[in-house]
From Swiss-Prot:
The lineage of its organism: Bacteria, Bacillati, Bacillota, Clostridia, Eubacteriales. InterPro entries: Aldolase_TIM, Thiazole_synthase_ThiG, ThiG. Its EC number is 2.8.1.10. 1-deoxy-D-xylulose 5-phosphate binds at G157, A184, G185, N206, T207. It comes from Clostridium acetobutylicum (strain ATCC 824 / DSM 792 / JCM 1419 / IAM 19013 / LMG 5710 / NBRC 13948 / NRRL B-527 / VKM B-1787 / 2291 / W). GO terms for cellular component: cytoplasm. This is Thiazole synthase.
Length: 255
């Protein structure tokens, strides 16, 4: 599969994997192996640098790209502070910005996200912001230096699929300067395949893998779905037609 480039790094997988709801950290190595993913997201609040046993980083291969997120931040200032803590803790300079002040629907605050992104880009971070799929805000994020834009497919953790499909289509069509990574709400492999067929550059999956009866097998299923969806997009899917179109001649073969 063709490579994806973010922040100057080339990736041979277009599936990003989250760790937020896994029953045990011990399953992480197997999930990452079967998913073929090269990018793993971790909530900074789960990184315990004082403990060798409970620190989630101990279960993550050093060859993977660690993408800490600012989960728990309610405004730009808190997100910036969390990003700096992550970098100081040795988590690198990649950061996924999550700014959520809405405790009911957990929808991202685009305004505060843009502020945090602009500040952190100036500090040398590779910033991947999680946002509501709004074209104007996506353009603002590109203008302030975001390395990718990560619009939600549905409310985080809902497993409801691509409920924002029409808005995602607009972003995918109009945002060409940086990758569009569909994040949140993807509930099954077919959702991931659909996002890739639409032209998304990558998808991030967490809850759908973590809450499956067999997370390792589900990770492999998502890997295959992302590959299939990307291949279909590159191959150029045939146009839909309102009426039937015969695949073989209907006349002349009995004469």
């Amino acid at each position: 599969m063709d490579e994806l480039e973010i922040g100057g790094v080339k990736l041979d997988s277009r599936l990003f994997v989250g760790t937020g709801k896994l029953a045990s950290n011990e399953v992480i190595p197997k999930i990452m192996e079967k998913s073929n993913s090269k990018v793993i997201t971790v909530a900074l609040r789960r990184v315990d640098i004082t403990s060798k046993q409970d620190n989630i980083l101990n279960f993550i291969d050093k060859d993977l790209i660690l993408l800490p997120n600012t989960s728990g931040a309610r405004n730009a200032e808190e997100a910036i502070r969390l990003a700096r803590i992550a970098k100081a803790a040795g988590c690198g300079n990649w950061i996924k910005i999550e700014v959520i002040s809405d405790n009911k629907y957990l929808l991202p605050d685009n305004y505060e996200t843009i502020k945090a992104t602009e500040a952190l880009v100036k500090e040398g971070f590779i910033v991947l912001p999680y946002v509501n799929p709004d074209l104007m805000d996506a353009r603002r994020l590109v203008n302030v230096g975001a390395a990718a834009v990560m619009p939600l497919g549905a409310p985080i953790g809902s497993n409801r699929g691509l409920r924002t499909k029409e808005m995602l289509k607009i972003l995918i069509e109009e945002i060409n300067e940086v990758p569009v990574v569909v994040d949140a709400g993807i509930g099954k492999p077919s959702d991931a395949a659909m996002a890739m067929e639409m032209g998304a550059d990558a998808v991030l999956v967490n809850t759908a893998i973590a809450t499956a009866d067999n997370p390792v097998l589900m990770a492999e299923a998502f890997s295959l779905a992302v590959k299939a969806g990307r291949m279909a997009y590159v191959a150029k899917i045939g146009e839909e037609k309102e009426y039937a179109s015969a695949s073989s001649p209907l006349t002349g073969f009995l004469r």
